[in-house]
Amino acid sequence: MPTVREVTYDLFRKHGMTRMFGNPGSTELPMLQDFPDDFEYVLGLQEAAVVGMADGHAQVTGRPALVNLHTAPGLGNAVGALFNAQANHSPVVVTVGNQTRSLMTVQANLTNRDAVRVPDPFVKYTYEPPRAEDVPLAIAHAIHLATLPPCGPVMISIPMDDWDVEMDASDAAHIINRNVSGRATADPASVVDLSERIKAAKNPIAVAGPDIDAAGAWEEMVALSENQNLGVWACPAPGGGRLGFPESHPHWRGVLPPAIGPVSQTLEGHDLILVVGMSVFPYYPNLAGPLLPEGAELVQITSDPDEAARAPMGDAIVADVKLTLAALLEQLDGTKREAPPAWPGPTRMEDSDTISGSVVCSILKEHLPEDAIIVLESPSSTLALRNQLRISKPNSYFFGCGGGLGFGLSAAVGIQIAEPDRPVVCVLGEGSVQYAVTAFWTAAAYNVPVTFLILRNEEYAILKWFAEIEQVTGSPGLDLPALETARIAAGYGIESRTAGTADEVDKELAEALADSKPRLVEVPVQPGMNLF
């Protein structure tokens, strides 16, 4: 009869999960024993970075990513990254070792005595099977839930003496060979009703969210915009983990502000607001105002029942975004409304003695290959990068929706591993780097050729901006003097350069993007926010 270990690896094969991101400990060694030749193990040096790599990998591939962590300490280290993965709707499947069953009652060293509670509420499913024979079924349960809409992370805790237990081969075959599909179609009546509301609207507008990209629905979203001459705003930056619409398209309106009052003010004059593939709305900070402009109605299309249920206003259709947009297009045959005026191009940036993050982003635009992927975690330069780059291909932009720092650096490594033929550029603030700095080692050790662009402003600029908005004065801990990321990365094996002028940035970026190894370019930039 097959062992639990053998069945589990066959289950992973069935789901295409033959790459494992991990940081092993003694409680995981029995699972990793005789590691299969057709599997790849990607070692990370700290668990938050491990989960971040898997998060990026899962998003860019659209498939579940496998993680293995070390009992309670390792899972604890990873919780912040699981929070990000949940916000990103990433199907990350986490296996965690535990002490042997015979020693759990006495709480021997490394016992995760309440394993299922540690990651809750940041996972869709968390479980420790009562019997060794139940491990493959529990993992299958987790995989199916992780990949059903809305996708999200899951965790299974497995005592270390379960792996050599034998189980029934027939039961194993049933577990392995199951298929579960979950793309829900919208109620036809609700689609017809929405189409009539769009036709009747005098000045409708759309807001495109990250799940358009995850669902592969760019083509349908562009077609809807062009069919009905809809302007399209991008999701507010805090929730804009992916792009749902090409930002070079003349119908693109820009990035919505992230607070209640400014959102309503920005959307004034529109009588119908169609929100696709996102929550309503990812607000932050708290700036009061009306939820909607006067006279406006809102309709949301989302695959996430919770996003629909928690929205404070408007109606919602819960269904697959791509299928729903396709069904909606069948009900529409053009419009007599005039097309919205073309959105202005990128703001021209002027040079100065100390260059700004905006200038660096404009230089990056000149070197960026057409098929490049951008991973961003520079909070003070997010809007500047979006404005300058105008990314216009699907599956090409990733940002941590959860707001927990550490996503960018680690996710970029996981994305580049998944997409070896596409250049990946990771734009980071030097503060963000520190939350997943060990991912530099993985990039160097596995020759993952990410170009890391570090904008060094020696402060938490976004926090100073929030302090102004919140009228908070005298807060400590907002400055980061003398933090030299280039030297840190070099210690992990990354070839690193510092560029202090626009000409130097131009030269170093050109060389980095042409290299087949990971490279880092650190640029000292002006303090403050970069909005354009």
Task: Please provide the spans of the model-predicted regions.
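Active-site diphosphate/adenylate-binding microenvironment
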Residues: 5-18, 23-26, 31-33, 342-421
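Short, small-residue-rich loop/turn micro-motifs
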Residues: 24-25, 96, 160, 236, ...
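Thiamine diphosphate
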Residues: 95, 103-111, 258, 264-267, ...
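A structural motif corresponding to the C-terminal end of an alpha-helix
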Residues: 122, 363-372, 489-494
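Phosphate/pyrophosphate-binding active-site segments
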Residues: 133, 171, 295-382, 500-532
